[in-house]
Amino acid sequence: MQLNSTEIAELIKKRIEQFNVSSEARNEGTIVAVTDGIIRIHGLADVMQGEMIELPGSRYAIALNLERDSVGAVVMGPYADLKEGDKVQSTGRILEVPVGNALLGRVVNTLGEPIDGKGAIDAAGFEPVEKIAPGVIERQSVDQPVQTGYKSVDAMIPVGRGQRELIIGDRQCGKTAMAVDAIINQKGTGIKCVYVAVGQKASTIANVVRKLEEHGALDHTIVVAASASESAALQYLAPYSGCTMGEYFRDRGEDALIVYDDLSKQAVAYRQISLLLKRPPGREAYPGDVFYLHSRLLERAARVNEQYVENYTNGEVKGKTGSLTALPIIETQAGDVSAFVPTNVISITDGQIFLETDLFNAGIRPAVNAGISVSRVGGAAQTKIIKKLGGGIRLALAQYRELAAFSQFASDLDDATREQLEHGERVTELMKQKQYAPLSIANMGVSLFAVEKGFLKGIELNKILDFEAALHSYMNSEHADLMKTINESGNYNDEIASKLNDALTNFKATQTW
């Protein structure tokens, strides 16, 4: 079969029309060095600071050092199989994590991927881990309480919604226990919680998750885990990921609580990354921007006003303020709060709860040192009944410590001094509390009323906690309406005081403890 020139021309034209080629332009680079989770890349000319770089094997690195002829990036995950000459490419994206209600009750890693074996997460969307904190005009003053359930904290060092309250102390003195109890106590309050574990043992994280589940608190909690076996990059970024997940609720007019456990280990991970990137070391070998590392994170915890929420949700949510309350944890070495990272975080936060090993070992748990613990803004947020009845607690403890030191040298004491000492001993004993047993507002109010009005006089020290437990049981069964009123309103007036006085007088007469 012979084709004439016209047919050949038509055939060629048809083939040309059907020809389809897709071209893709991408910015590609080559790994020139791999060192302990840090890679140096040549050829990525227009990469952004903090941009995700795609590596072989569906992994990513984050660009941290942008130099004249190379890029220093930190690998998110395993890096042992990366080698010199491997091709990488820029993505044009900043690191984002999933957010939304679907994350509640789940355990995720720094990237928001589930690690609890409960299947995929249907997230509401993705948001960047690094965000700018709300401005001055967008904020509102702190005036609503976050009840931790601890008598010593809620009475003396109250925490408000949108506050940053540091929990600081040596290892093994109850820092995590206090934070976990605060999360457990938010059950039924509508406050969503985020627990960020940085550099913890995997067994410790598993134990926390188990305890939250046992006490019905996992349903309102997101656990972000970057255990000690994870890379330094994942440990450094975990608090920012958790913060973004918490901000989702804040920006939609809800209240959230986030625990960073702990920021000392995050600073160590960041120091490791910085030294490997050959950034100049400063005090204690930390890089120069370690203050900014924590300040830009903790400034994102805030109470935002109605206008901010309305603008953020495009008018969907009106008349609601949102808040993100932060409880950062810092571990000190031998009680040294003047080290670099502790002083940084103390200066950033709105107060600190200082836990002491000596008090912990003496059986005073929670081991709160009332003398140097402070809440700078929480007083305005305190519940009325606890503010009114708890006011004398700090003073009683301060006087007791002063007199206890003096009485070691004085042989005989006058009656007034002895009475103050005994009152201080009773207050110290009453402030003790078991783990995983946070108190309601009414139960706490009853305990504070008992010590304030002298109902603990004449009770042996070793019987005070038994007296308190029996009193709570009696009040919740015999005076349920009064307890319900106090729990719902948090008010304290002459009528409530009179009813409490009658109830405690009757209870003390029964001698049932």
UniProtKB/Swiss-Prot annotation:
ATP binds at G169, D170, R171, Q172, C173, G174, K175, T176. It comes from the Bacteria. GO terms for cellular component: plasma membrane; proton-transporting ATP synthase complex. Its main location: membrane. Its EC number is 7.1.2.2. It catalyses: ATP + H2O + 4 H(+)(in) = ADP + phosphate + 5 H(+)(out). It is found in: Cell inner membrane. PROSITE patterns: ATPASE_ALPHA_BETA. Keywords: ATP synthesis, ATP-binding, Cell inner membrane, Cell membrane, CF(1), Hydrogen ion transport, Ion transport, Membrane, Nucleotide-binding, Translocase, Transport. The keyword Nucleotide-binding applies. The record marks S373 as: Required for activity. Pfam families: ATP-synt_ab (PF00006), ATP-synt_ab_C (PF00306), ATP-synt_ab_N (PF02874). Coiled coil: none annotated. Gene3D superfamilies: 2.40.30.20, ATP synthase alpha/beta chain, C-terminal domain, P-loop containing nucleotide triphosphate hydrolases. It is a peripheral membrane protein. GO terms for molecular function: ADP binding; ATP binding; proton-transporting ATP synthase activity, rotational mechanism. Belongs to the ATPase alpha/beta chains family. Produces ATP from ADP in the presence of a proton gradient across the membrane. The alpha chain is a regulatory subunit. F-type ATPases have 2 components, CF(1) - the catalytic core - and CF(0) - the membrane proton channel. CF(1) has five subunits: alpha(3), beta(3), gamma(1), delta(1), epsilon(1). CF(0) has three main subunits: a(1), b(2) and c(9-12). The alpha and beta chains form an alternating ring which encloses part of the gamma chain. CF(1) is attached to CF(0) by a central stalk formed by the gamma and epsilon chains, while a peripheral stalk is formed by the delta and b chains. This is ATP synthase subunit alpha. It comes from Alteromonas mediterranea (strain DSM 17117 / CIP 110805 / LMG 28347 / Deep ecotype).
